[in-house]
Amino acid sequence: MILHAIVDDLRVARAAIDGGATHVQLRLKNLPTAELIDEGRPFRDLCARSGVTFVVNDDVDAAIALGADGVHLGREDGGIERAREANLLLGLSAQTVEEALAVDNERPDYLGAGPIWATPVKPGIPALGLVGLAELCESVAAPVIAIGGVDATNAALCLEAGAVGVAVVRASTDAAAVRTALERAAF
């Protein structure tokens, strides 16, 4: 079971790891690569000390320079082949079943699917819902990580729908409660 914390603050990353996050994804949007590398070093070091998988959002070059474990790419990011050449864990995003089928052809290590519920992090994007998540999970070969409005009250429902884990943004500071909910659902 995967608990993927998406963070832009080192204190939040530390709280998420202390709460049981298995992956930390550094999401610092619109930074030049050199600045992302500088900002990312403390996150990389924290994850390395904690034995947590470190993923960089959107920037393959920064992921490689930081020695990250992986990179998560959106539909517009590119860099899939470069990520493979660098042996990075590769995560791709999808918001619909159709998008999921298209990106599944790229053979990602995981697929981030959502938003499952409406979320201020992605305003204006229609929610997939649990039925849509279940359909998406059944349609693709890649393991699915549910994202979007996920917290301790609904994380287990994502596993029941077929996801192998969840990603949290706002709930990263409440990772312990999310982790407990996932562990209960796994039994």
Where are these regions (language model features)?
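Short, glycine/charged-rich beta-strand-loop motifs at protein surfaces that mediate ligand recognition
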Residues: P120-G124
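Conserved N-terminal beta1-alpha1 strand-loop-helix module at the mouth
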Residues: M1-Y110, I125-L128, E135, A141-V144, ...
